[in-house]
Amino acid sequence: GLAVVLWQIAQLSPVQQPLLFAALAVAISFLSASQDIVFDAWRTDVLPSDERGLGSSLMVASYRAAMVMSGGVAFIWAEQWQSWAKVYQTMAWLMLAAAVLTVLVAERYERAPGQKLAAPGRELLAFVLMLVGVAAAVWLARAVLILFGLDPNDANKWIQLLFLLSEIALALPTALWLARRFGFDTLNRSLDSFFTREGAWSVLALIVLYKLGDAFAGSLTTPFLLRELQFTSAEVGIVNKIMGLGASIFGALVGGLMMVRIGLYRALLWFGVLQLVSNFGFLLLAWYGRGTLGSFELPPFDIVIASLDHRATVDWALASVVFVEQLAAGMGTAAFLALLTALSHSQFSATQFALLSALGSVGRVYVSPVSGVLAPAIGWPAFFAFTALMALPGLLMLHAMRARIVQIERQ
């Protein structure tokens, strides 16, 4: 499906056929998201417990490598060929090759029979009604706040945060009620399966809290480096694209290999502590500023993911902090995905992994408004100290749930 849509969009002009082009772009987003869910479900089903860590690390490393392909190589091809149509056609052929390779080499997996779900038509109707209900709930929450004289476009970030939290508070229970009311069995039974387990709410809290400190720090890292410390865009881009991306891939692979030896609980604990410590690097940058450790020069280069047509000076402190932070993030993400894999029941692996990973992204998505308010209010050094403190609740909960995590790993 992705190959076909990519091929079709290559034949269109966004200027002459904007509506059809936009529709195909939406289709690409829908199909790619569906592909992610199916792949995660397949990986969850086929990997035995002792291979979840390494499998998750390989997935993280491959995902980052694919980002290089789509975000770096594609632009190089576009410049060389002077044609985005050829780039999309090439991507279509690559997707077709991946589909053929999947058919040829992917392990067949026969899922154990489970409970019969509702008819697909009824499920689709329930899903559509749930989306409509969520949209209506968001509109209603905004309307109520507007009636009280608040403006959703107000420059005050506290007011923007109030709108966001109000919309979530009304939309989430509305979605769950509609799913129950209209028989969205895939979602309902997935939730029932999860919440009948021992300590389900504690596990959900751990999922939200584990990456929270990392999410707080990452949400404002780039504005901090560019606006506060006055690093150049080229310097930050070079460090992030080369050292940061390389460190995250390396960290994911190292984390996977370590999980084979130390197990899931200790991996989550050790990598979580490393993520906490890495936030102090930005605290030191905020205290001492640029130039503390000196700098080094990069000669001109042209590689797959980046190019530089002149010599550039790179700050050693910046490079070191970003390398350590991305290394820790890669290791922590690999362990975190291994936990989500272990938590997903084989009968509902697609739905449960998608829901759990979405829950794990709550911090990353919704802390940005809070961070945007907090950093100017308390200052950058205090903000990064706060991000480190926000990593502690997840680690403390992880320690308290040690026996439960070990039990989950062995399932």
What are these regions (language model features)?
Residues 49-58, 233-235, 346-356:
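Loop-to-transmembrane helix entry/capping segments in MFS-fold secondary transporters
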Residues 69-78, 222, 255, 367-375:
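Small-residue (Gly/Pro/Ala) motifs that create kinks and tight helix-helix packing interfaces
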Residues 78, 250-270, 285, 290, ...:
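Helix-to-loop junctions at the C-terminal end of transmembrane segments
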Residues 149-154, 210, 219-237:
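Short amphipathic helix-loop junctions that connect adjacent transmembrane helices
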Residues 245, 343-377:
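A late C-terminal transmembrane helix in Major Facilitator Superfamily
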